[in-house]
């Protein structure tokens, strides 16, 4: 079959080939026709560079298809592609590569289809048919990759003159790109544009979606109309650079001006003013930098990085640092940001306290690592940790130490990994992020160490409303801990919770395993609605039992209390109040049983039954009885006493009312 090969000069070569020809074969045919060595040829089809060992049919190249021939005129080069997630991709390219070809390389590396890619350089979107050299993209240049996540949308840009410009954009467009579109429409250079949305100046490197700018949103365009000012930048070598700037210039923009003058890439620059490192997205006016102010330029010798410092309040501080920074330096940066004196700071990483004279690289602290900041509130103290084997460990701690830090100290002493440790104090499991002082743990307090020997399990907690809560627990969890989990899920304070299992109320200091509570067991949750009260239970033998109960106790729970006191199994108990048999699932308050009320306990000896008693007035009374009931036994119904004096003799019965 015939195929065509088009060169960058516009010349078209016709080749006779077969679908089974390799790309290497095709290059040999081009060499025969044009004299171009195969190692200087790169063939492109459908935006992809063709590999020598593959065949035409592998790429679905059919008769009269057109390949594009790109010559390796100058050696290759590396460029970088930065995504919105911050990931940087390195690509091997040539100046003659088309943008389409670059997108194909990105697809090969990242799997992103070319039609979902938009490449930005110097604030401009790159067109598929153009080459890298067309855009003056040189070695080690950085392109920005924006994904076409959703279809385009319209936004409006309103100028101070009242004119409104309509732009076609995508949520993933950068502000820099929007300014380029405004330049295309209005001829205003991007560096003279400031875009405002919701009262904020928009930063070039951010996207419309970062600012939640949606379709038909209106941005405000402010021009940099007033004249600039001079500032000075002093380097560590003592050299002073003079820059023409405006108060609205971003730090990023100032760094670009320094690059223009001195050739120092922005990512190697750190600018300091009034002891603070300046952040790229902020403006000179944000830092109150005025005319003839002097900034200090510090170079990132081995490439800076960002780390995070998390305080005990949960606040996270972002710091710009270098691997060679000492811990002392880092504390100084924290002081600049938060005002905390270095001697009150303790920095923790991977469970270890960091020493002032050491560097971040000494501790293998890398970009985006998180340090924990603990304040030295008071001097140190000793606490004890008791294991289940009876061994007692002595630890030197401070009230401001986190539980995580205590676990790290235990690991140092005993070799037990922190994730296998559970620390208990006053019946509560201690949470990693909290401090000893949060739990009022003082000098010479004793913590209990429980090992996570087996994985967790699920249990269920059923409320009186019928709702079932699922909890992830461990057999060694205390009841207090389970109540804390219920509070997390349902918001019920632990002191209002009573947990029942197998008819018993569970005590806070005991564990689930103490009660033989296993996976998928169901506990019953009873709320302490009002304070407790005393009631009486009268048996048929005349004995009276006193019980401590709450109005929210279920009848089932009352029976459990009777079992605890008298040893009578709940299924043999029948409780009567105001002539009614009480149902297990109902509460005392359901029956209006109040303090010092008396219930009657009837035993189910051989299974109960119902009988009917018909009065002379025609009324029928239903009674719950047992075959063992005597005829002379008195029963209460509707507040009256029904006395039967039926004789077991063969004579007709005589009935009387009292």
Swiss-Prot record:
The record marks 68 as: Essential for function. It comes from the Eukaryota. There is a cross-link at residue 76 (Glycyl lysine isopeptide (Gly-Lys) (interchain with K-? in acceptor proteins)). The modification Phosphoserine is found at residue 65. The record marks 54, 72 as: Interacts with activating enzyme. Pfam families: ubiquitin. Residues 1-76, 77-152, 153-228, 229-304, 305-380, 381-456, 457-532, 533-608 form the Ubiquitin-like domain. Keywords: Cytoplasm, Isopeptide bond, Nucleus, Phosphoprotein, Repeat, Ubl conjugation. There is a cross-link at residues 6, 11, 27, 29, 33, 48, 63 (Glycyl lysine isopeptide (Lys-Gly) (interchain with G-Cter in ubiquitin)). InterPro entries: Ubiquitin-like_dom (IPR000626), Ubiquitin-like_domsf (IPR029071), Ubiquitin_CS (IPR019954), Ubiquitin_dom (IPR019956), Ubiquitin_ubiquitin-like (IPR050158). It is found in: Cytoplasm; Nucleus. Ubiquitin Exists either covalently attached to another protein, or free (unanchored). When covalently bound, it is conjugated to target proteins via an isopeptide bond either as a monomer (monoubiquitin), a polymer linked via different Lys residues of the ubiquitin (polyubiquitin chains) or a linear polymer linked via the initiator Met of the ubiquitin (linear polyubiquitin chains). PANTHER family: UBIQUITIN. Belongs to the ubiquitin family. For the sake of clarity sequence features are annotated only for the first chain, and are not repeated for each of the following chains. This is Polyubiquitin.
């Amino acid at each position: 079959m015939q195929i065509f090969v088009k060169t960058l000069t516009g010349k078209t070569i016709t080749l006779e080939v077969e679908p089974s020809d390799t790309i290497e074969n095709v290059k040999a045919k081009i060499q025969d026709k044009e004299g171009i060595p195969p190692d200087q040829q790169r063939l492109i089809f459908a935006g992809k560079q063709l590999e020598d060992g593959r065949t035409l049919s592998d790429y679905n190249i059919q008769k009269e298809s057109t390949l594009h021939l790109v010559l390796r005129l100058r050696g290759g080069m590396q460029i970088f592609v930065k995504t919105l997630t911050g990931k940087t991709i390195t690509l091997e390219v040539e100046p003659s590569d088309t943008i389409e070809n670059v997108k194909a390389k990105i697809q090969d590396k990242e799997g992103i289809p070319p039609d979902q890619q938009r490449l930005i350089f110097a604030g401009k979107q790159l067109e598929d048919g153009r080459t890298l050299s067309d855009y003056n993209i040189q070695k080690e240049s950085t392109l920005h990759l924006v994904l076409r996540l959703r279809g385009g949308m319209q936004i409006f840009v309103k100028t101070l003159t009242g004119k409104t410009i309509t732009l076609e954009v995508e949520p993933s467009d950068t502000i820099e790109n929007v300014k380029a579109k405004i330049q295309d429409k209005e001829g205003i250079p991007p560096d003279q544009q400031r875009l405002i949305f919701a009262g904020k100046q928009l930063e070039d490197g951010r996207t419309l979606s970062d600012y939640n700018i949606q379709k038909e949103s209106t941005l405000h365009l402010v021009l940099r109309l007033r004249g600039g000012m001079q500032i000075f930048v002093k380097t560590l070598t003592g050299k002073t650079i003079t820059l023409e700037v405006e108060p609205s210039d971003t730090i990023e923009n100032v760094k670009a001006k320094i690059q223009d003058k001195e050739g120092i890439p922005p990512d190697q620059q750190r600018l300091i003013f009034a002891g603070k490192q300046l952040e790229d997205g902020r403006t000179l006016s944000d830092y109150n930098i005025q005319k003839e102010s002097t900034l200090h330029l510090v170079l990132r010798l081995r490439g800076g990085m960002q780390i995070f410092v998390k305080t005990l309040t949960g606040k996270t501080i972002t710091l710009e640092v270098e691997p060679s920074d000492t811990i002392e330096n880092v504390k100084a940066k924290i002081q600049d940001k938060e005002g905390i004196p270095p001697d009150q700071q303790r920095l923790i990483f991977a469970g270890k306290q960091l020493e002032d004279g050491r560097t971040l690289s000494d501790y293998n602290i890398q970009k985006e690592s998180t340090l924990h900041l603990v304040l030295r509130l008071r001097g140190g103290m000793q606490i004890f940790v008791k294991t289940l084997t009876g061994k007692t460990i002595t630890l030197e701690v401070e009230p401001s130490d986190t539980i995580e830090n205590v676990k790290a100290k235990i690991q140092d002493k005993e070799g037990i990994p922190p994730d296998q440790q559970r620390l208990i104090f006053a019946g509560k499991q201690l949470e990693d992020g909290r401090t000893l002082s949060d739990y009022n743990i003082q000098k010479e307090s004793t913590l209990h160490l429980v090992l996570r020997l087996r994985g967790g399990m699920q249990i269920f907690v059923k409320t009186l409303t019928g709702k079932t809560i699922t909890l992830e627990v461990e057999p060694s969890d205390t009841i207090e801990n389970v109540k804390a989990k219920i509070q997390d899920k349902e918001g019920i304070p632990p002191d209002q919770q009573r947990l029942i299992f197998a008819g018993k109320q569970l005590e806070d200091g005991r564990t689930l395993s103490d009660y033989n509570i296993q996976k998928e067991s169901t506990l019953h949750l009873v709320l302490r609605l009002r304070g407790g009260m005393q009631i009486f239970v009268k048996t048929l033998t005349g004995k009276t039992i006193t019980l401590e109960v709450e109005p929210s106790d279920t009848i089932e729970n009352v029976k459990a209390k009777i079992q605890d006191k008298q040893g009578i199994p709940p299924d043999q108990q029948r409780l009567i109040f105001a002539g009614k048999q009480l149902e297990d699932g109902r509460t005392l308050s359901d029956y209006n049983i109040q303090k010092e009320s008396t219930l009657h306990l009837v035993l189910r000896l051989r299974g109960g039954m119902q009988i009917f008693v018909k009065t002379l007035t025609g009324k029928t009374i239903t009674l719950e009885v047992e075959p063992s009931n005597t005829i002379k036994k008195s029963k209460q119904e509707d507040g009256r006493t029904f006395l039967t004096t039926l004789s077991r003799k063969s004579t007709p019965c005589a009935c009387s009312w009292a």
